[in-house]
Amino acid sequence: MKIIINNDFPVAKVGADQITTLVSAKVHSCIYRPRLSIADGAAPRVCLYRAPPGYGKTVALAFEWLRHRTAGRPAVWLSLRASSYSEFDICAEIIEQLETFEMVKFSRVREGVSKPALLRDLASSLWQSTSNNEIETLVCLDNINHDLDLPLLHALMEFMLNTPKNIRFAVAGNTIKGFSQLKLAGAMREYTEKDLAFSAEEAVALAEAESVLGVPEEQIETLVQEVEGWPALVVFLLKRELPAKHISAVVEVDNYFRDEIFEAIPERYRVFLANSSLLDFVTPDQYNYVFKCVNGVSCIKYLSTNYMLLRHVSGEPAQFTLHPVLRNFLREITWTENPAKRSYLLKRAAFWHWRRGEYQYAIRISLRANDCRWAVSMSERIILDLSFRQGEIDALRQWLLELPKQAWHQKPIVLISYAWVLYFSQQGARAEKLIKDLSSQSDKKNKWQEKEWLQLVLAIGKATKDEMLSSEELCNKWISLFGDSNAVGKGAALTCLAFIFASEYRFAELEKVLAQAQAVNKFAKQNFAFGWLYVARFQQALASGKMGWARQIITQARTDSRAQMMESEFTSKMFDALELELHYELRCLDTSEEKLSKILEFISNHGVTDVFFSVCRAVSAWRLGRSDLNGSIEILEWAKAHAVEKNLPRLEVMSQIEIYQRLVCQGITGINNLKTLEDHKIFSGQHSAPLKARLLLVQSLVLSRDRNFHSAAHRALLAIQQARKINAGQLEVRGLLCLAGAQAGAGDLKKAQLNIVYAVEIAKQLQCFQTVLDEVCLIERIIPASCEAFTAVNLDQAIGAFSLPRIVEIGKSAENKADALLTRKQIAVLRLVKEGCSNKQIATNMHVTEDAIKWHMRKIFATLNVVNRTQATIEAERQGII
């Protein structure tokens, strides 16, 4: 998307009249966002920009006016901020501006007939100006608001519907009152709060326009996420050139909310707005109960219709919520003005959810009230719901610790839930002690024992301790014994199996269990498990190296209400941690210490082996790229120490392999230690292939450093074989580059260049950008002779072309088709065919013979069932292969 930074919009053709000066001032130092333009002639005739204050509605409108005038076409600008505007005033203003363009000439009307005073008469007059009906004219109406009378709004809508087709309208406001006719007629396109919010790219462009130099792009992207793109807030925070822990407490933001929103609405609605901020979401009945009133319906309707301050919760049309930053601002006002009622109101809100069976919200709000005593009488069903279906790990841990100790022994299910929480808090030893004690009890009458929740907790808990083989056996056994009578437990067990298969690169088995798990979890409303299914799918994408697919999975997870990304703090933090490696690979890592420290704190308390290693490896690699070798090794040593403390041997071995790789460049001899590492029992399990591949790569680098290039190439080939066996794309890319380095060191530049080209092509297809950059940097330091090979294939240009922090979204279906139909080399050939290269040019580019390219083309034609290059390109694009 092209973004134009505007300091002086090209309005030379417009003329230096008052309206031009007024409109030009509105866009000074703003950015032009083409995605908000109405330039498309096939678009509806009316464009409505509607959102709360500060979303750039007027700016978008002004840019449209200037764009229209710059093209030499007539444009009318009218601001309706004044509540005293009448239909006569509006009609007269439009006529006056149209007359300057000679669109209408009422002086030629016969004597005794005055200019139209009503909009419907003006519409008729415009139809009579047949000579001008081909000239596209834009009428911009700014500040459409609820203060305008409904008859006036209806007159405006009728005017828009009844004017000639060459007249188009752009409208900006904060109300939807009066627009029903336009919606019904299908004559209107809406740009809402979501559309008007800044994207990360737009915020970066704004920072450039404002010469903001102190905030890196990654931090700007994080800022946009935190304020959900609210343009006014982005501007205020960029000008400060530093983020704030509590954005609503920033003086400029506080003043803006107070002046433009809070003080701008009537008193009764201010009270409602402030009260609503105490609730996670608001419904009329809930509000009326909590605050003992009867005006919930009218207030919600007024604020959502006339100010756009309340928005629908996705998938829940009866629920409304506030923008999170605005909600924090309003909460501060509420607690400051009336602190004594805090606990009382929160308890009423918690009890409201409790009565409706919404225990997740009830527990969360009661924790904010610092009072959980009333919840001691929870039934077993409720506790199980919170533990297994909602996955409220943090809230449950806090709540359970506050319960009286006697309650623990009165209800065995409390101990089971606590064991569940301990497993997901990396305290497996304590959890197993609890389970052992409970297993020794022989009370067969307890419901918790009949449903075998204890055995399920043990089965899934083993996976959190990285005891995958034991966990898989116990989960399968539990499903066969109890799955038919316990859908919630079956969904949890199937989800655990999915995570195990993703961790062990068993992707064929993963596909089968995912389909079954999704069906069961949907039936059982297993929200916590849905989040973990996304984790399993994301792990598969990362393990395969398919970063475009991984990005798509994250996006889907964040918008899927079943995954509870917004409702569950635990699930949200889990995805933040997983996303770190993806962002590093795409070169858009948020390196703010605050963000990193939060993620590191989370994984130290809750991170299973795969998540823990993913985060530490990404942070270590990032530090190494900044020439911070000590910091790079430090976090890996921390991971290793954590692994020893928690008895996680796989994490210990992976961390040690990464440490050895960091030490290779320093000339430290470690080949003997690497050989002894192979004897570790972890290399005989299901995780052996990726572990062996990682170890072989480090061994190859060590041998190359010692100039034993033949053995180094052999180790690299073995690593490639291991990677291909499990479809680990990133490891294959690294293996090919290590092989090329060894070959270059041995003097075989032709083979080295061939493998470099192949590695780069795989990286392009996978979009694993940083892998290539990191590996090449390492190899060139260890094997100086390899620099010539990398230079010969113009690697800098190749990397520069695909290492930008923008990716092509690749759907899963396309990923699978590409893997199933064509080889990576064939896809590489097709890409070059699409660029117009001849067979000879492709052969030169890929460092192979022309006959080899012809052979690949015949295979491609046969696979895609086509007869020529053009058809092959079209069919491959249709199937999403290229």
From Swiss-Prot:
PROSITE patterns: HTH_LUXR_2
Pfam families: GerE
Pathway where this protein functions: Hydrocarbon metabolism; alkane degradation
One annotated GO biological process: regulation of DNA-templated transcription
Induction: Protein expression is autoregulated and sigma S-dependent in stationary phase.
Residues noted as binding ATP in the record, renumbered to the chain: 51-58
Any GO molecular function: ATP binding
Keywords of the record: ATP-binding, DNA-binding, Nucleotide-binding, Plasmid, Transcription, Transcription regulation
Gene3D superfamilies documented for this protein: Winged helix-like DNA-binding domain superfamily/Winged helix DNA-binding domain (1.10.10.10)
Residues annotated to bind DNA: 839-858
Function: This protein activates the expression of alkBFGHJKL operon in the presence of alkanes.
Protein name, entry field: HTH-type transcriptional regulator AlkS
Gene responsible for this protein: alkS
